[in-house]
Structure formats: C-alpha cells, structure tokens
C-alpha cells in the first residue's frame, strides 16, 4: 500500500495523518520529512525507501484499511547526515516543518500543529556544507531540445554561477558538454524530451534526471522570467537575445530553483553566454583515462588531488572547474601565467597563502545569506573574511607594484573595502555564537537596547527568586519553604503537607502532590509572566535583528560576491605559483602554429609518487611530424609518456606552469585517448568492442588541431585483424585527419610506416644484464628491436617453468618465421594474394534472407559509429546462427 492509494478517503484518519496526506499530495515526487516533535517521520512508501537507503528501523503507526501504516524516522538534530546520504543516492527530499501552534490548545480535541514544506532538497540545488563536500559543486543543468538545436543552461546556487549555450544538436557534443559541466541533476521538459537520449545520458553521466512541466520551458515566457530575475527590460546586454532555446533552459532553472528553495534568488544577478569552442573538448573517456579529477582506482591519485593545495574551499572548487574545462583563449592563459610569475618573484605567494588560510567558504555563505538560510556562524565566517581583506591586499602589494600583471591589479581592486560591514558584524554578533539561531545568545550585548533589557530580566531571575524565598520564609515563619520551577506548573512555592496548614491566606494552591502542596502568589505570578515572556520575547527579538542583518547583507551581495570571486581566483593563482616552486615547473609558451614541443617533460602524478628519480622525456610533434609510433616493452613507459604529454598540454591550457624544462604548444581543439582495456559488462560489450567504439569516435570527430593518444589499437582480436586495423588507423589519422598523434603499439610491423610522410618511429629503451631486464623509461628516436615480453613476464613473477617453456616455443616460432621469409616472395606486408578463379555463373544467390532484409532496412547514413558497430555484430550473429 502506498500513500497515494489512501488519499481517496481521509475521514478515517487522525487529523495529523489527514494533514500529512494533504502535504504529501503536493510533493509526491519527493521523500517527505514530516516534522513531529524531535523527529522527522516518513510514512508508507517513503518510510520503506528511507529505511532501505539509510539502514534505519521500519516500524508502524496506526492503521490504514486495517493494515499497519509503515513509518520510519530520524532525529531532527541529526537530520543533515541522513539527508546527505539520501541526496548522494539521487533522492529528492521535501522538508515539512512545524510553523505554528495547534488550535484549541486548551481542549482535549487538539488540532494538529500547522506544518508546511519550507524547502525541497535535490541533488542539484544544495547549498548546505553538511550536504556537499568542500570541493564538490552542486550543478543544476537544463536541456531544451527542439528539432536539430539544443539550449543548455547551468545554475550553481551555492556559487551564484549561471551560464547558457545554444548550438546545433549533436549527441556526441552533448556528452562532451555534460562531462565538462559535471551536472548533479539534469532538468528536462517532460513533453519534449526523447527517452532514448535520456537513457544514453544516464549511461554517460551519473546524475539525477528530473522531468518538469512544459510551461517551465515555454519560449514565450522565458524572456520575461529572466528579465524579472535580473531586473532588466532586455537581455541584449547578456548576448542571449537571439538564443530562444538557451533562454528557455535558463528560465526552467529559475522556476525550479525558486520552487525548491521557496524564496527568491537575489544572488543570481546575471547570466554568461558560453560557446563550446571556447574550451578544449574532453569526452568522458579522456577525462577518466587522464585521471583529471578522480583516480581510476580507489587508492589512486588524480591530477586535482596532487595540485590542489588551495587555502580556501572556493579556491579548490574553482581549480576543479579550471581543470575540467581548459580554455583556448591564449590571452586569458597568458594573464594567468603573468600573475603566477609575478607571485613567484620574491616568494610573494607565501604571505598571500597565509592570509587566505584564515578565510572561510564565503562563496557558499553568501548563497545562504541570499536564500535566507544563513546561520549565525555563517556571519562569523563573513566577518572574519572582511577582517582579512586589508591583510590580503597588503600581502599582494609587492606582487602588483610593478603593474606587470593586469589580472592581479584587477583582482586587488575587486577585493574592495568592507570596513563598515566588518564593524557592523563585529558589533552585532557574539564572538562564538551557537549553531542555531533558536538557541539564543547570538546577538551581541549592546547592539540593541530592547534585547538587552529583556535579557536583564531573564538573567536576573535567579537572584529575584533567592530574595523572594528568603522573604517568604520570614513572613510565613516556615524555614524550609522552597521556590521551584517546572514546565508544567511554572514557578511555585512548595510546602510539605504538615506545613500547608501554615500557608498564608494570599497563597493560591496550584498543584497537590502526594507529600506536598504547591502554591503561587500574586507577586510570584507577576514575576513568572514577566520572566517567561522575556525569554520568548528575547528570542523573537534576536530573530528579528538577525533577519535585519541578512537584509543589510543582501543589499551588499553584489560587492560581496565580487570579493568572494576575487579571493577564489587569487587562491588558485597562488596555488599555481606554490606548485611551480614546489615541483620545479616552468612557464609554457603558446604558438599559432600546429605542434607540441616539450623538453624534459614529466608525468606530474607519477613523478610525485615515485620513490626513484623520474626519467624526463621530450615530445616533438608539428605539421611535418604529426604521428609518433612508439614501440618497446610493456612497463617501459609508453602509456606514461603519452599521458604526460596530454597532462602537460592540459595544464598549459589551464594557465598553469607545467612539469617540463620548456613547453611550446600550438592550438588544440580536443584531446582524445584510447588507452587501457576493459569489458563493458553493463552493455555486454567485449574488450575489443569497447576498443573499436572508442577508436571509431576518434576517427569520426578528430580534426587537424586534435591531440590523439592511442595505445595498443587492435590487440583485442587476432594478430592479422588487429595489425590491419592499427595500420589503417595510423594512415587515416595521418593522411586524412592530419591530427597530432602518439600511437603506442606492440605491432613492430607498423614501424615500416616510418618511411611515410609525417610519421616518425620512437621507442622506450630497455637493456638486458645477466639475463635480467632493466627498463630505462627513456623515449628515443627509432623503432624498438624487440618487445622483451618474456623478461617482463619474469619481472611480474610468472613461474620459472612457464618462462622456460615460453622460451622454447619462442625459438621455434622465430625459426619458422625466418624460414618463411627466406622462401616467401618479397611482397608488401599487405599485398593481396592471388585468389582462385570462381565461376560466378555457378554461384547461387538467395533472393531473400534475414540478413539481406536487415541490411536493406538499415539507414547507413544516419547511424552513429557505435550503432554501426552494433549492427555489424548483429549481422554477424545472424550469419552464424
């Protein structure tokens, strides 16, 4: 039974459950956290799901149609931990709070306390630190697809980032953009979205997909929605007036964010237009193979893990975004490099980093201020940041005095001056406030006279009671008379049963106990009213003052956001300088000419983790030398060399110094990788099928400005099939596509292509000493002489008996090959042998067959590379069966 089924007839339920159903009816898509006292309770299917996901007890409360109602709950004070787990599991949670008192409080038939949903937490709309890792971003993305065009919008509520783009719809390009944007949640039009596209997205990107009403994506209303949000009459200043699908996607995000946050979005004040051509394209496979953000293995180290020593969380998140979207504009890159160089001179980055260490996560604090969810300690973080601004500007002064870095000068200006705001927060908030406003004692003494007076009444209650107790003992003549308090009875004077007979006439009986009587007096009652009301009035006053502070901060939100952004950028630049000094990295140069020239390059992660000195290598590719075929033994360093070339290029196009003595790079539009081997068990694809699919993507989408890394193409099938494919791929990449390519292989026959134009042979060096193989990891010009496969197997621990047997077989095979070449006609490796003549008149062709029917139905021109390969496998399977 689920909650929806029970909503038809509510009359048999308690008032509280009737209220629950009414709220749940409006939020059927979400798990409803329904506040009941000190717990958030869940019922029916919500309870079952939460119990399974959170590992909490599933119990029951009352009955529905004669069956127990499933219930599960979590303590409200520990709810954040449970919410974080649910959001990580892709769930949406509606928080329903108690917002008032029940009616008829004095009667036995008390109405339920008023409740309402105060916010909806989804994977893409998180702003709470407790629900989001320090370096994680909560990116909400909307897709608006119509015919052959697509609009894409991104909103990060926690960082006030709002971006859009619109272009021709291509499935491959969409995957690349989603991999760059790293969405936590994708919003789509429930009426227009193609289910096949959604299924493919789910396979490519791990995130939640939420379907929204068509009205949210309405093209006619989008303009007004965005103009209202930004407080403008036209969007021409943002450059998106002519992009209807981009505007529709952006408007859909505004609608969704307002609905989930239950408030306006004052910190979303502008929108940025992006072009996919602004960035070097990195598909999901390349991002994974290069281990940019996440390592391939659980205990591995990614590039981000290695170089992220940013002193602020917002700096770390900015670094992550920079690594995920390397830019192609060399003017921006040189500005970053100039700033880094200026910080390196005289060790200026060190004092800057010391100041940055004292600054909290202001970016997220400001988002919570804007949304009205900021807590007292958020304002303390903001106060500390404002206090550090003068020190940060002073630390930057030596680096900007030469004015050689325009970027540093701009960032220094954007830091601003917040002395007045700092003074306001200093006078308004106590030094160490409690976590929650409702705990009181958040507003500092002396900030508000009315609050001080209410606190005085509350805080001096103890002394008043002591004085009153002494007074009553003396006037009544009862020396053991006591004055006490509890929440049920309030304040009281307690006498034993024996003493009750001596109670003065003005004592009014309040409560009778087994061995005592409790009384109230007019004076004590007056005091009680004053004290109890002062407590609640003080809390109400604090809430009012705190909200007033938030409103003041909202008025300064634009300048505060500029300050926050400047801090994050300075942090990243100082981190670049720190890494350059620490790792001995150097500044790269850019050239308009196609090519990659790296002298003594190193793999940054491998070098940092290696216990032995790293062997640097050169990379040389240009318009006359586009292809490097790399041969040599396994474990010799071929894959590491290829990856280091890609990572050095990536770092350079992020504006960072690079692990090389020098690096000069021409334009790069995309980096491809075909490295490693693995079955795709989820789709039933073999290692070879995965390899061919990835290779197909490269051959269809690489350009003359692409950097392509290909490792062991063709190894997943028979020797001649694999060699033929590898041979053809090398020629296609070199002659038709003309990209820059590093091609590692064990097919030594491919080295014959070194005589072709633009193709060079390289090998990783190794030598044998006393029967043992020593891998030198040096890349040198020319082909390898042998693969040293048996020696590598020996290093890997293969039993000696197996190695010995393999050596015997190797000698036999080598002898057979030598005899073959001595007697064979010296034909080209791929010369086609003469075939026996076939009498075509005797060939019987079946007019109909399932295979022919299948072929006739195929629209070959519309197939993607992946679909073409799958169709080929299906045809092969039909022939065999």
UniProtKB/Swiss-Prot annotation:
Going by the entry's taxonomy, the superkingdom of the source organism is recorded as Bacteria
This protein is called: DNA mismatch repair protein MutS
Which PROSITE patterns does the record associate with it?
A: DNA_MISMATCH_REPAIR_2 (PS00486)
Record GO biological process: mismatch repair
Q: Which Gene3D superfamilies match?
A: 1.10.1420.10, 6.10.140.430, DNA repair protein MutS, domain I (3.40.1170.10), MutS, connector domain (3.30.420.110), P-loop containing nucleotide triphosphate hydrolases (3.40.50.300)
Give me the segments passing through the membrane: none
Show the HAMAP family listed in the entry: MutS
Keywords annotated in UniProt = ATP-binding, DNA damage, DNA repair, DNA-binding, Nucleotide-binding
GO MF, any single term: ATP-dependent DNA damage sensor activity
Family stated for the protein in its record: Belongs to the DNA mismatch repair MutS family.
The residues that the entry says bind ATP are 632-639
The record's NCBIfam families line, in alphabetical order, gives: mutS1, PRK05399.1
State if Lipid metabolism is listed as a keyword: no
CC terms in the record's Gene Ontology section:
cytosol
Q: What does this protein do?
A: This protein is involved in the repair of mismatches in DNA. It is possible that it carries out the mismatch recognition step. This protein has a weak ATPase activity.
Q: Which InterPro entries match?
A: DNA_mismatch_repair_MutS, DNA_mismatch_repair_MutS-lik_N, DNA_mismatch_repair_MutS/MSH, DNA_mismatch_repair_MutS_C, DNA_mismatch_repair_MutS_clamp, DNA_mismatch_repair_MutS_core, DNA_mismatch_repair_MutS_N, DNA_mismatch_repair_MutS_sf
| Short name of any one Pfam family annotated for the protein | MutS_I
